[in-house]
UniProtKB/Swiss-Prot annotation:
One GO term (biological process): tRNA 5'-leader removal
Name of this chain's protein: Ribonuclease P protein component
Source organism per UniProt: Histophilus somni (strain 2336) (Haemophilus somnus)
Classification via InterPro entries: Ribosomal_Su5_D2-typ_SF, Ribsml_uS5_D2-typ_fold_subgr, RNase_P
Pfam families: Ribonuclease_P (PF00825)
Assigned protein family: Belongs to the RnpA family.
Reaction(s) this enzyme catalyzes, per UniProt: Endonucleolytic cleavage of RNA, removing 5'-extranucleotides from tRNA precursor
Record gene name: rnpA
Its job: RNaseP catalyzes the removal of the 5'-leader sequence from pre-tRNA to produce the mature 5'-terminus. It can also cleave other RNA substrates such as 4.5S RNA. The protein component plays an auxiliary but essential role in vivo by binding to the 5'-leader sequence and broadening the substrate specificity of the ribozyme.
Keywords annotated in UniProt: Endonuclease, Hydrolase, Nuclease, RNA-binding, tRNA processing
Source organism superkingdom: Bacteria
GO MF term list: 3'-tRNA processing endoribonuclease activity; ribonuclease P activity; tRNA binding
EC number: 3.1.26.5
Length: 119
């Protein structure tokens, strides 16, 4: 049975972890969100989030996006290969409600899964 938690070991925590992902990543994106991915040598996937104040001024909006992003990752982590992921938000992210954001992320995760299976 797959554990669906989001413990500390499932997060990208240090700048060096993020730098690794930014070097030659697999990229899937929409106008509002980009997900970068890079293979890791662990037995699980990890997630890092970047939500800029430039795109979402209020903290509660940034927290909402991060909360929904973590939840979508948590639910699909059993299907995701051993990759490190960084979710980068873009300008139109504030226009999406919770359901649209979750659907967009789900679509991007599924696109990533197909991309990995092809390669």
């Amino acid at each position: 049975m797959v554990k669906l938690g989001f413990s500390r070991e499932l997060r990208l925590l240090t700048p060096s972890h993020f730098k690794c992902v930014f070097q030659k990543p697999l990229r899937v994106s929409t106008p509002e969100i980009t997900i970068l991915a890079r293979k890791n040598n662990l037995e699980h996937s990890r997630l890092g989030l970047t939500v800029a104040k430039k795109h979402l001024k209020r903290a509660h909006d940034r927290n909402r996006v991060k909360r929904i992003s973590r939840e979508s990752f948590r639910l699909l982590q059993g299907q995701l290969a051993n990759y490190d992921f960084v979710i980068i938000t873009k300008k139109g992210i504030g226009n999406l409600d919770n359901q649209q954001l979750f659907q967009t992320l789900d679509k991007l995760w599924k696109r990533h899964i197909r991309l990995v299976q092809k390669s």
